[in-house]
Amino acid sequence: ILASFCREEGDLDAAREIKNKSEQQKNITIIDYDGTNRNQLLEEMSRSIYIIAARFHGTILGLTAGKSVFPILYSDKTKYVLEDLGFHGEYADLRDPDSLSFENAKKNLESGYKIDVTESVQNAEKHFEKLDEFLNN
């Protein structure tokens, strides 16, 4: 799948361009996430073997689904979250064009690199419980 998370930033156009350039067009599905098709997106991601994520949410959803993920960073936000999660796999940074290569992108898939983020997800849910308590009192 190619998932567009932000039409305004050109995600959908980029997904279409990637699909059009691929020799595997018939095997590529584009999902234009619009806030109403969350289940479709999550189902498709859960069926994926490998996720190359150029958006923060794609990275987090892929890790949460227990998938091997190759993050493509565009800001330090994703980098810091990956560090907090203990991610030691390969990634690319758009600010360093040399890091973005096919050879680099396939390393996490070939090694089967995954991390378990279950504890982090549970801790995040606890933060929301505390926020709910605060807001409801």
Report each predicted region and the residues it spans.
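Active-site anion-handling motifs in enzyme catalytic cores
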Residues: I1-N137
